[in-house]
């Protein structure tokens, strides 16, 4: 489990109702930070960072109704009666979008 710092007012920080996420990680791949500014300039938001190693953990596309991608694995801690905030938020977005 690693501590991911969440950007203030990001969707993921609202879902977790926190400025950090504690989730299980298993890194085999890393985002190459040399592309960060280019991707930010076209609307990608880097909303979660593992600060100890400056690793991108969460990205969002704010212009879409719900787009969150994570390097951590919320499926490992999610349970049927207690889904992780990302899954709960995703399901809520699906329900809201289908009204």
From Swiss-Prot:
<feature type="binding site">
    <location>
        <position position="28"/>
    </location>
    <ligand>
        <name>L-glutamine</name>
    </ligand>
</feature>
<dbReference type="GO" id="GO:0044210">
    <property type="term" value="P:'de novo' CTP biosynthetic process"/>
</dbReference>
<keyword id="KW-0547">Nucleotide-binding</keyword>
<dbReference type="Pfam" id="PF00117">
    <property type="entry name" value="GATase"/>
</dbReference>
<comment type="pathway">
    <text>Pyrimidine metabolism; CTP biosynthesis via de novo pathway; CTP from UDP: step 2/2.</text>
</comment>
<dbReference type="GO" id="GO:0042802">
    <property type="term" value="F:identical protein binding"/>
</dbReference>
<keyword id="KW-0436">Ligase</keyword>
<dbReference type="GO" id="GO:0004359">
    <property type="term" value="F:glutaminase activity"/>
</dbReference>
<comment type="similarity">
    <text>Belongs to the CTP synthase family.</text>
</comment>
<comment type="subunit">
    <text>Homotetramer.</text>
</comment>
<dbReference type="GO" id="GO:0019856">
    <property type="term" value="P:pyrimidine nucleobase biosynthetic process"/>
</dbReference>
<keyword id="KW-0067">ATP-binding</keyword>
<dbReference type="InterPro" id="IPR017926">
    <property type="entry name" value="GATASE"/>
</dbReference>
<keyword id="KW-0315">Glutamine amidotransferase</keyword>
<dbReference type="InterPro" id="IPR029062">
    <property type="entry name" value="Class_I_gatase-like"/>
</dbReference>
<dbReference type="GO" id="GO:0005524">
    <property type="term" value="F:ATP binding"/>
</dbReference>
<protein>
    <recommendedName>
        <fullName>CTP synthase</fullName>
        <ecNumber>6.3.4.2</ecNumber>
    </recommendedName>
</protein>
<feature type="domain" description="Glutamine amidotransferase type-1">
    <location>
        <begin position="1"/>
        <end position="99"/>
    </location>
</feature>
<keyword id="KW-0665">Pyrimidine biosynthesis</keyword>
<feature type="active site">
    <location>
        <position position="73"/>
    </location>
</feature>
<comment type="function">
    <text>Catalyzes the ATP-dependent amination of UTP to CTP with either L-glutamine or ammonia as the source of nitrogen. Regulates intracellular CTP levels through interactions with the four ribonucleotide triphosphates.</text>
</comment>
<dbReference type="GO" id="GO:0046872">
    <property type="term" value="F:metal ion binding"/>
</dbReference>
<feature type="active site">
    <location>
        <position position="75"/>
    </location>
</feature>
<dbReference type="GO" id="GO:0003883">
    <property type="term" value="F:CTP synthase activity"/>
</dbReference>
<dbReference type="GO" id="GO:0005829">
    <property type="term" value="C:cytosol"/>
</dbReference>
<dbReference type="InterPro" id="IPR004468">
    <property type="entry name" value="CTP_synthase"/>
</dbReference>
<keyword id="KW-0479">Metal-binding</keyword>
<keyword id="KW-0460">Magnesium</keyword>
């Amino acid at each position: 489990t690693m501590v991911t710092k969440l950007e203030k007012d990001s969707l993921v920080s609202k879902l977790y109702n926190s400025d950090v996420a504690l989730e299980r990680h298993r890194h085999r791949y890393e985002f190459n930070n040399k592309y960060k500014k280019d991707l930010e300039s076209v609307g990608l938001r880097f909303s979660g960072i593992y600060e100890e190693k400056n690793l991108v953990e969460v990205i969002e596309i704010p212009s879409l109704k719900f787009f969150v991608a994570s390097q951590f694995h919320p499926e490992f801690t999610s349970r049927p009666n207690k889904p992780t905030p990302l899954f709960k938020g995703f399901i809520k977005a699906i329900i809201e979008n289908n009204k």
